[in-house]
């Protein structure tokens, strides 16, 4: 076997090995996604928590809960949210618990009626009540700008309405009158007081995507291995 053929064998072997490693990596990612999804289902299907004060639980993510307290007067409009091909906002309102601390409640979607000058009517009369929903991460949207540590591109539309491009519960003290906020957002059920247009889809596992990628990598590895072996045997035949 001459040096050229040896080099080709090495290159084919390395390529097949690399493609196989990528395939196994995608399978590992799929397994991680499945485990994460199983954890989500377990938490989301567990019994409801009842919170009247800021919880000391380490992780409330995806837990269903009943909150007792009252809505604050201020409302946040999370910009550039589209529903049924219509532009609008997600409305987030601090909800004061009985101990004075607060939870940021995602009340759903509202239309801007095709104009950024339109200010929707979303206020709620302050009253003690109970609301149901579940905890989850804040909506992901917007681009972080240099020098903005709280809200990016904030815009006051009225005495109690602020339009924002990105949200971070850890920096909401000046919006919630200095009250501490849970790090998770509370997603309100559609039948509750204060709910707007609520049409949320809970996340799937996402493992199918990684399994499909793994199949692609393994298929490419198999095809490349076949081509390499076929060329090796074909060139070797005349020498025998």
PLM ranges: what are they?
Residues 1-54, 60-240:
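Surface-exposed, charge/polar-rich loops and edge strands
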């Amino acid at each position: 076997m001459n040096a050229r053929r040896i080099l080709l064998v090495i290159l084919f072997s390395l390529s097949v090995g690399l493609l196989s490693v990528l395939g196994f990596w995608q399978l590992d990612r799929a397994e991680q996604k499945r485990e994460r999804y199983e954890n989500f289902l377990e938490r989301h299907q567990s019994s409801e928590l009842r919170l009247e004060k800021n919880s000391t639980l380490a992780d409330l993510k995806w837990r269903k809960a009943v909150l007792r307290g009252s809505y604050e007067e201020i409302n946040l409009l999370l910009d550039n949210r589209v529903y049924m091909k219509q532009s609008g906002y997600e409305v987030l309102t601090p909800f004061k618990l009985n101990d004075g601390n607060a939870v940021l409640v995602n009340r759903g979607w509202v239309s801007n009626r095709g104009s950024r000058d339109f200010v929707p009517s979303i206020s709620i009369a302050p009253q003690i009540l109970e609301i149901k929903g579940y905890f989850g991460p804040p909506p992901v949207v917007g681009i972080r700008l240099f020098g903005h540590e709280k809200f990016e591109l904030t815009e006051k539309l009225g005495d109690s309405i602020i339009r924002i491009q990105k949200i971070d519960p850890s920096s909401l003290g000046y919006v919630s009158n200095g009250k501490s906020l849970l790090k998770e957002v509370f997603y309100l059920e559609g039948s509750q007081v204060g709910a707007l247009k609520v049409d949320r889809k809970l996340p799937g596992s996402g493992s199918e995507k990684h399994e499909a990628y793994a199949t692609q990598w393994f298929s490419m590895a198999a095809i490349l291995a076949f081509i390499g072996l076929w060329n090796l045997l074909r060139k070797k035949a005349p020498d025998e």
